[in-house]
């Protein structure tokens, strides 16, 4: 999954995940034919972003979440989508939308997210890396617990790729957001 800024306060992940904020009262809307596990991942990402911004690490007004509504959409709504592996990407897109800090256009990321920000391993890594490489994205954040999976892949898949292993989503924020 690839992250690139489309407009201020609106993020798009290679036309796969979009997050916008707008005036509101804290509402959170999900669209794009997501399954239950993916919806749970989005909910975890929202809770995590609220917790890290309320602690003052990022410059977000403490009342921001009460004064804004959020909409997360995954295009191609006719296509069912599910699984936890977009959690890190959703959290990164949400933090970018909330702070206005753009995400580097040359990165992709994958990983299940916990409420405490841990990045858990995912399946389908080969396909995700191939998709990134095909899209011309060679910097990919991958759960550290997937390192053995990467090492088992054919060199033709990983050659020319900068695979960045992470344990916590804060590592992704530090390297993927354009501070």
Please report, for each region that a protein language model flagged, where it lies by residue:
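Single conserved hydrophobic/aromatic residue that forms the stacking wall/gate
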Residues: 1-9, 13
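Peripheral, non-AAA+ core regions of ATP-driven protein-machinery
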Residues: 14-179
